[in-house]
Amino acid sequence: VQTAGYSLTEQQPLNNIVRVAYQAMAGVLGGCQSLHTDSMDETLGLPTESAVRVALRTQQIIAHETGVHRTVDPLAGSYYVESLTDQMESDANILIDEIDGLGGVVQGIHKGYFRRSIAEASYRFGQEMEAGDRIVVGVNAYRAGNEDAQVDLLQIPHSVETIQCERLETFLKSRDDDKAMLAL
């Protein structure tokens, strides 16, 4: 399970720590086998070392301080969780039927189904935010403090980009294009 990077915001990035923590806890409560927690500053660029450490500490706190590991299925029997699961299953079956109707996943890709679906969902999300139907703390509500820089950004020297471009150029010149095309 990976926490939902799309839910992170550029505004008030420290709030992303809370977003990542509750998403991680939800994954653990749902019985995930492995967990990746996004860093609070990933919407701004590559994560800083301190942000990565906070993401790691989030996992460690959940693992060692919450007691969640003491039971196999802590949400078993919850009517609310069962109703959410039933709704998710119903929604998933509708999507599966749509994709099957297109001729399968590959045809869906060729027909632009997935890109279109993601774009439409993103548009709806934005419309809901603008209308105030969906509150995103720090973005369309509780915005005081947005003018303050809250986190440092990772600064990568220009020389690193130059070196990587040179390495790529050398690689591209030395590779066998026929073998590359065959491999693809």
Where are these regions (language model features)?
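Core alpha/beta catalytic barrel or barrel-like domain that forms the active/cofactor pocket
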Residues: 1-10, 25-44, 61-82
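Active-site cavity-forming subdomains of large catalytic enzyme subunits
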Residues: 10, 15-21
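Flexible, glycine-rich loop/tail regions that form catalytic "lids" or insertion modules at the edges
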Residues: 48-49, 53, 57-60, 64-184
